[in-house]
Amino acid sequence: IHEAGGLVSVGVDVLSLGVIKPPGNYDVDFVIGEGQLLGNVPAAGGPLLGILASKYNRKWIQAIPGRLVGATNEMNSNSPGYCITLQTREQHIRREKATSNICTNESITAVNAAIYMAALGKRGFVELSQGLADRGHYLAGRLGEIDGVSAPLYQPFFSDFVVDFGNITHDVLEKECIERGFVPGIKFSDEGCKRLIAVSDLHSKEDLDNFVNVVKEVLQ
């Protein structure tokens, strides 16, 4: 793509970055992601925390929406300090031409994410990522052992994966599983009964095993 004069952007699951190489290691130009899962609650679609990063390119940075906070050192103590940078992009200078007008201000989600990551620390973040990967692959393996079920359909994967539940319909699978206390993921395709399954750090091994037993019962 670069040889043809194009730019490369990649979307990432930020929680996977504790166990896989970060995008900066494979020469992409832009990285996008969703930070809602960094200490924020699943609030039925909002407020959310968008993540956007680029290589250092002054032209690109000037065009990025939102306010930019830069890291520097305090003048007297030389301690780390942070301030809004490139302020010529801002509303109080450029008014209606400001690029920070493009996005909404949902700073509380960014504060939550900062607190969450600070509380985890580097080691905690790696352990969280590894735990999610382990749960996802364990559940995919258990579901794949059920007759008529194919899991995972696509590899490699981190913690979310697609399952083909066979001849059952989406409506019947949802109804029967929900009645038993489980949501069987979300519809992935109208072809067959393919659904996207996700795990989280709140799911214990017992939870995953119980879900497998429910699926077995429903598919009998």
Language model: regions and residue ranges:
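Conserved C-terminal alpha-helix-loop-beta "cap" of PLP-dependent enzymes
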Residues: R123-N210
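C-terminal alpha-helix
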Residues: V214-V218
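Active-site C-terminal subdomain of aminotransferase-like
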Residues: L38-D147, A151-Y154
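Conserved PLP-enzyme active-site core in the AAT-like
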Residues: I1-G81, G148, V163, N167, ...
